């Protein structure tokens, strides 16, 4: 039914709030069509030769709705789609952050995955790389730290430990007391 495609489009729109991220490029990097051709995302039905996607959002009920849209057809090369509303989108949503959590647990396989993808040794869409990079960021300080700390404590209680990233080994561990366990040895339900 395309639920994952819709979620990836919404994720791409959230990422496009960053002025360094192109909406059309992020759509292609999260969907991974052959040869990075955005035109491959058009429904394969007779007579269908173009696509238009419009994302509408607002920060709260007191702010006006902002739109971000993308148009492309079967002749569009790579990610050269027509994008409308990108500057306004960036201006209004620059402070949001998002992460797409893939159905497959990926952190236990993160060792050198980013480097392998960058060298084209393996092929994963950006959602996997983005979640690995986000998981490596120290979130213990910064804005909303009280709210975030409360959420982290709730998660730590559920998993009976904390997730720890070893920068030298490029590996994740579940830390319980004084012991740590390799993430690939942790039960899959806890890893997710």
Where are these regions (language model features)?
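Helix-to-loop junction immediately C-terminal to a conserved catalytic motif
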Residues: 11
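Walker A/P-loop
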Residues: 4
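Phosphate-coordinating catalytic segments in nucleotide- and nucleic-acid-processing enzymes
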Residues: 16-192
């Amino acid at each position: 039914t395309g639920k994952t495609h819709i979620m990836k489009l919404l994720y791409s729109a959230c990422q496009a709030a960053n002025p360094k991220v192109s909406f059309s490029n992020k759509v292609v990097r999260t969907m991974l069509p052959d040869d990075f051709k955005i035109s491959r995302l058009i429904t394969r039905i007779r007579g269908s030769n173009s696509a238009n996607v419009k994302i509408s959002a607002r920060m709260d009920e007191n702010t006006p709705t902002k739109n971000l849209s993308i148009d492309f057809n079967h002749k569009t090369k790579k990610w050269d789609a027509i994008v409308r509303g990108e500057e306004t989108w960036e201006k209004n949503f620059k402070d949001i952050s998002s992460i797409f959590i893939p159905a497959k647990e990926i952190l236990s396989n993160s060792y050198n995955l980013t480097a392998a993808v960058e060298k084209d040794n393996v092929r994963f869409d950006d959602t996997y790389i983005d979640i690995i990079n986000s998981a490596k960021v120290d979130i213990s300080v910064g804005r909303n730290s009280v709210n975030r700390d409360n959420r982290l404590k709730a998660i730590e209680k559920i998993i009976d430990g904390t997730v720890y990233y070893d920068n030298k080994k490029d590996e994740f561990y579940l830390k319980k007391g004084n012991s740590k366990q390799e993430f690939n040895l942790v039960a899959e339900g806890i890893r997710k």
